[in-house]
Amino acid sequence: MQTQILERMESEVRTYSRSFPTVFTEAKGARLHAEDGNQYIDFLAGAGTLNYGHNHPKLKQALADYIASDGIVHGLDMWSAAKRDYLETLEEVILKPRGLDYKVHLPGPTGTNAVEAAIRLARNAKGRHNIVTFTNGFHGVTMGALATTGNRKFREATGGIPTQGASFMPFDGYMGEGVDTLSYFEKLLGDNSGGLDVPAAVIIETVQGEGGINPAGIPWLQRLEKICRDHDMLLIVDDIQAGCGRTGKFFSFEHAGITPDIVTNSKSLSGFGLPFAHVLMRPELDIWKPGQYNGTFRGFNLAFVTAAAAMRHFWSDDTFERDVQRKGRVVEDRFQKLASFMTEKGHPASERGRGLMRGLDVGDGDMADKITAQAFKNGLIIETSGHSGQVIKCLCPLTITDEDLVGGLDILEQSVKEVFGQA
């Protein structure tokens, strides 16, 4: 296995190649194959970008057929047959059945593009600059999105340029069990001397991913929506990692029965790992002037093709979402048992999440790193998240077979016991 050119030429900023130091050559479903002959079960799935697995045959065929037909690949924001099909499918398969009426902005290929566009739109729509965000939230690393991201590691990488225009509030559960964090927010909103500039919008992940798999409670989300309505603030749901079925519903906010003013999607939106993002907005918020927010790669037709194919194949009825919810219960049960095992061994641990977005909080980053490193040696790829990397994070493909799901969980259990000297 030759890695010299990779180690010599790629920037020190790389991360995943340090955690999983091998050269991958092919992938299918929830399996990755490496150059040295080893294979791995994938509980990372491109950090939530491969909800439908690697190289899903239906999506691969749709893409191959489109390329073979000399279909438009790059067209800026010009109209194409692929874009038309994508928008029609989005409306008919996803939006209308959920009673949602949104216009679509295609801002560029990444999630942070979508967040930048969303917060800029909110500021223009309300004529106010402040965006309320939450502790442990992650919304991207470009300057506008970074201002709403809590992680100090990312915020310190600006070279001294201050991040501005956002105010942080405590997320649900941040202050401990039983503490009503929204009452604090409401108190500031009602106090002209509280120091909080009147917000244009609130941005929220219903389940925080990078922050440690922290699910906001359903009543908490419903109350947050009401606060936004009562105080003339827009509600932005960042569904970049939690969306596209990850929590067991296409949109993660469906569990709470709320209707955001603006939604951002990316990661698994293309269905195939292709770079793609969109912003959904209530029609009356579409106040952009032509070309006011643009980008060279805002019309990636290959992603239109695979995204439309994914929506038709997986979301035309509720069969897929029920299967995701079933698998989520399997992971939840196994993670709870692992948490109990660790706690009994004197190392308190806990499980949390929603759907197939689940975390095992082992208390400290060193322990989590030992377990995930051992899991990699045993044939499982799984990462960590949280303020100190203390949460082992399951983001396996939603399409994973029961055999691979149980196999991956068995490897994780084996790895935990090996770290504790019990194997």
From Swiss-Prot:
The modification N6-(pyridoxal phosphate)lysine is found at residue 267. SUPFAM superfamilies: PLP-dependent transferases (SSF53383). Belongs to the class-III pyridoxal-phosphate-dependent aminotransferase family. It comes from Chromohalobacter salexigens (strain ATCC BAA-138 / DSM 3043 / CIP 106854 / NCIMB 13768 / 1H11). GO terms for molecular function: diaminobutyrate-2-oxoglutarate transaminase activity; diaminobutyrate-pyruvate transaminase activity; pyridoxal phosphate binding. This is Diaminobutyrate--2-oxoglutarate transaminase. One of its GO terms (biological process) is ectoine biosynthetic process. Keywords: Aminotransferase, Pyridoxal phosphate, Transferase. Disulfide bonds: none annotated. Pfam families: Aminotran_3 (PF00202). Its EC number is 2.6.1.76. NCBIfam families: dat, ectoine_ectB, PRK09264.1. The keyword Transferase applies. Its cofactor is pyridoxal 5'-phosphate. Homohexamer. Pathway: Amine and polyamine biosynthesis; ectoine biosynthesis; L-ectoine from L-aspartate 4-semialdehyde: step 1/3. It comes from the Bacteria. PROSITE patterns: AA_TRANSFER_CLASS_3.
